[in-house]
């Protein structure tokens, strides 16, 4: 069953499992998820549930979006995403009415999830840092220390050529992370491993797409 919820990365810590092993944990706040719109094949061409997360002020919200939030009888939201699901993968989100709160009970401890976020921006970086290329000679008259090397033919550009440029600040998805614990009172997810993006960054948590074998799943847990 396809499930999804929005959250904000709080930070990382570590916990002990039942075997006494130290497990790296990412804490994600999933409180105040509100259903803004339900989409279906007949009207929109696909099935999806639009969710809003994290309040923002009215004065920094456009008038069309203010009307959209007013229909859902909720305050303006900073982070809006659609949880798309196929007809055969019916989600319990589709049963919620517009304006309803999305509970963290959608997921259970031990579930495998895919977490999508925006990676940390590193700014302009060279090929050694950005693409892990080897550096050139440092002595004996060489001037090719950290240069990218040949650009290819004079005419035209080669698609996919590894060159210096913006590093990071891209949409990244980490698959098959284990939901280590769920705090229903504080609406917190404790996810085993790292999650893309900085602290206070928004993330989308969905049910894992790729199925693992029993051996792989046990190794994850």
Curated annotation (Swiss-Prot):
Any one annotated GO CC term: cytosolic large ribosomal subunit
Specify the domain of life of the species encoding this protein: Bacteria
Q: Which Pfam families match?
A: Ribosomal_L3 (PF00297)
GO annotation (BP), single: translation
Enumerate the InterPro entries for this protein.
Answer: Ribosomal_uL3 (IPR000597), Ribosomal_uL3_bac/org-type (IPR019927), Ribosomal_uL3_CS (IPR019926), Transl_B-barrel_sf (IPR009000)
Any idea which UniProt keywords this protein has? Ribonucleoprotein, Ribosomal protein, RNA-binding, rRNA-binding
Q: Which GO terms describe its molecular function?
A: rRNA binding; structural constituent of ribosome
Annotated region (Disordered) at 131-165
| Its biological purpose | One of the primary rRNA binding proteins, it binds directly near the 3'-end of the 23S rRNA, where it nucleates assembly of the 50S subunit.
Subunit organization: Part of the 50S ribosomal subunit. Forms a cluster with proteins L14 and L19.
Q: Which family does it belong to?
A: Belongs to the universal ribosomal protein uL3 family.
| Alphabetized NCBIfam families for the sequence | L3_bact (TIGR03625)
The protein in question is named: Large ribosomal subunit protein uL3
Q: Tell me the organism.
A: Phytoplasma australiense
